[in-house]
Amino acid sequence: MNTTNKQLTEELNNTESNNDHNDFAENNIINLKQLKRKLPEELQVQAEELKIENISSLLKQELVFAILKKSVEQGGLIVGEGVLEVLPDGFGFLRSPEVNYLAGPDDIYISPSQIRRFGLRTGDTVEGQIRAPKAGERYFALLKVNRVNFEDPAKAYHRVHFDNLTPLYPDEKLGLELENNSKDSKDFSTRVIELVAPMGKGQRALIVAPPRTGKTVLLQNIAHAITTNNPEVFLIVLLIDERPEEVTDMQRSVRGEVVSSTFDEPASRHVQLAEMVIEKAKRLVEHKKDVVILVDAITRLARAYNTVVPSSGKVLTGGVDANALQRPKRFFGAARNIENGGSLTIIGTALIETGSRMDEVIFEEFKGTGNSEIVLDRKIADKRIYPAIDITRSGTRKEDLLVDKIILNKMWVLRRIIDPMGSSEAIEFLLKKLENTKTNCAFFEMMKSPERPRNGL
């Protein structure tokens, strides 16, 4: 171990000393991540300036590769970043979230010796200086490792494996409440969630949703609340088997990492993307970071696993293979609060009432695995009341660890008041009360003491 640490220190020292050689001007340093974020039109303009031929026939990844190669020929320095995928042969590639972790010509090769030296695993976010392909090579290669998971590379060597970390109930609240300055009922969705099913860091939550009940908008509102109130949280939105226009809408409305696999892609692609996302999240949690993954939808992910898993010969009701749900359950079960720092929160949607027996079986299998549930009601949505949350059927386990005792008592009083009502009347009643206040604290101030619950509001 001492020898390994010595080699690691020498490597880091070499990295620092080598950073000084080739003193390029600022405009000669190309950031690969920023380059990939550019629009195709902007890349074409840059390619024309570099006098690259046949631009119109190149895909975006091929265009990025051509720009990088030409820039290196003209004396440029390239700094790249990506998420490591280690292949069975021992070497790996840095995949880019900008292209949904698809393999492409602009991926960065990492040698087996570098992977061993820094203790890297699939899912590690690696940043460093890269070099152009030599004669006979196809890919750019990592020259120096500057950071691993946004920290010093030496820290990656001493981290504890995710499976060895101790899981606990969530005990730190994930703030979702946003002040309301309009009377648009959609604005109250996160406030309603705070009242009926508060979320904590490390929560494993299911949004149970029939079709057309506003689950996508609800996810967008949750994502916006998380990025606004919890800037320390690393947010990933994972869209599986989704419509392309919904992907674009989510990318433009969410300030976080949005990765997707659309319905026209094979099931193996859905699975590969989900595995990359969960491995990346685990590596960040090992570095004591708080990560939130919003998944739309867990049901479609389970369908994809059912397609790619080798047949066991045992088929359950609805055509679900007996072994198909083990891996999506492992994905969902990775959500946990970690003792001594770090958490992984997963909020996923489960589809019901789709007319598919398979979807019902998948939902029943996942039903008891979460520790928080938000149930959407089709009857409420048909009345165009949003959020279409069924208050009486929604809730969080061990909510007393997340909410102050006085507030918790008032939340229970609220539940006793709305319990005799129907689901539609309950949400209408609550929204009407929330319209008169900007925050939930102000709403609770309107409530009288818990001794008289029937006249509480």
UniProtKB/Swiss-Prot annotation:
GO terms for MF: ATP binding; ATP hydrolysis activity; ATP-dependent activity, acting on RNA; helicase activity; RNA binding
Cystine pairs: none
SMART domains the UniProt entry points to: AAA (SM00382), CSP (SM00357), Rho_N (SM00959)
Database matches in Pfam families: ATP-synt_ab, Rho_N, Rho_RNA_bind
Keyword Transcription regulation: yes
GO biological process, one term: DNA-templated transcription termination
Keyword terms of this UniProt record: ATP-binding, Helicase, Hydrolase, Nucleotide-binding, RNA-binding, Transcription, Transcription regulation, Transcription termination
UniProt GO cellular component terms: cytosol
Record-listed E.C. numbers: 3.6.4.-
Domain spans labelled Rho RNA-BD: 77-152
Positions of region (Disordered): 1-23
Subunit text: Homohexamer. The homohexamer assembles into an open ring structure.
Role played: Facilitates transcription termination by a mechanism that involves Rho binding to the nascent RNA, activation of Rho's RNA-dependent ATPase activity, and release of the mRNA from the DNA template.
Family note: Belongs to the Rho family.
Name this polypeptide is given: Transcription termination factor Rho
Gene name in the database record: rho
